[in-house]
Structure formats: C-alpha cells, structure tokens
Amino acid sequence: MMEFVYPHTHLVAGVDEVGRGPLVGAVVTAAVILDPAKPIVGLNDSKKLSEKRRLALCDEIKEKALCWSLGRAEPHEIDELNILHATMLAMQRAVAGLSIVPEFVLIDGNRCPSLPMPSLAVVKGDSRVAEISAASILAKVTRDAEMATLDLAFPHYGFAQHKGYPTAVHLQKLQEHGATEHHRRSFGPVKRALGLASN
C-alpha cells in the first residue's frame, strides 16, 4: 500500500460512499470537514464499528464537525449511468453540499470524481483518515436508516437485515415476490427476477 501523506492545508474534506453492492436503494455518500479544536475519539471504518457505536459517533460528528453534507444517486440514476459513474456523481453532490468550500478533498478508494479543488484517492482511507472515517459513518448510518424505512414498506424482503445486499435470503425473496420500484434494474439478479436478462 502506498504511503499516505496528509495534505498540508486547513480545510480538508473526507468523502466516502455506502451502497455500491446492494441490489436496492440509493448509493449514499458523505463529505465531512472536521474541526481540529473538537477531536472525535474512536473514528474508524464504519464497517468495523458496532451499530450502537456508529449511531453515537454519527451524532458526535454532526455536532462537532465544521460542516458535513450527504449526497446520493438514486436507483434510476445507477441504472442509467452504471454504479461507478453514479457513485462519482453522488460524491460530487456531497462535496458541493458542504457549507464551507474545502481546500483539499480526500476520497476513499482508488479513484476521484471530477472536483473543482485538489483531491486524492486513499486506498482503505476509511480506516486511515479521520475525515473519511467520519464520512463513512454518516453515509452508513443514513443508508441503514433508509433500508429500515424501506423494510416497513416491504416487510417480506428483509431489507432491515441485509441492507439490500445480494444475500441468499434477498435473492430468494426477489424470486418469490419480484422486484420493487426501489430495486436496481441494471443489476443481474434483479434483471433475472424481472425476466429481462438475455441469458
């Protein structure tokens, strides 16, 4: 892994996404500029934290960060653009939504969206960079809450448990009940459930 050097500038935003792999719902992104005067203890990759810890940190991030913003790309945008381009669009939206313009943006992963300020992709940034960790927590808590809401509307799919990922249970329910309007029609298992697959 390449050595990461934190940029020597004041206003650094971290950006991360949640929801590239699921078959249903939006891909959700977050951008966060932390306040050096208000450190937050325990920031880490959201996937490595318990749900209870994520929720507590989410509240603390919203309270202490200089600013934060959420972005998203809806299922129809994912189907039109493909998941990679839709994710880049959602990241751009999160950065554009910040009330303070960052001087530098650090993105989790290996590629950056086109932004009007300097940016750098950081592999495993969600466990290496506090701003990206904070963004990953906001994005995951937001998307998980959306899946819980969707679960209330469509209780037989189990969205609250699998968050829309292609688990055996989700694939079985897709076969039994078909796709909802929230499913991503360009994804293979959904295509097959709708009878749209060419194979």
From Swiss-Prot:
Keywords: Cytoplasm, Endonuclease, Hydrolase, Manganese, Metal-binding, Nuclease. One of its GO terms (cellular component) is cytoplasm. GO terms for biological process: DNA replication, removal of RNA primer; mismatch repair. It is found in: Cytoplasm. NCBIfam families: PRK00015.1-1, PRK00015.1-3, PRK00015.1-4. Pfam families: RNase_HII. Its cofactor is Mn(2+); Mg(2+). A divalent metal cation binds at D16, E17, D108. Its EC number is 3.1.26.4. Endonuclease that specifically degrades the RNA of RNA-DNA hybrids. Its main location: cytoplasm. The lineage of its organism: Bacteria, Pseudomonadati, Pseudomonadota, Gammaproteobacteria, Enterobacterales. It comes from Klebsiella pneumoniae (strain 342). This is Ribonuclease HII. Residues 10-199 form the RNase H type-2 domain. The gene is rnhB. Manganese or magnesium. Binds 1 divalent metal ion per monomer in the absence of substrate. May bind a second metal ion after substrate binding. Belongs to the RNase HII family. It catalyses: Endonucleolytic cleavage to 5'-phosphomonoester. One of its GO terms (molecular function) is RNA-DNA hybrid ribonuclease activity. It comes from the Bacteria.
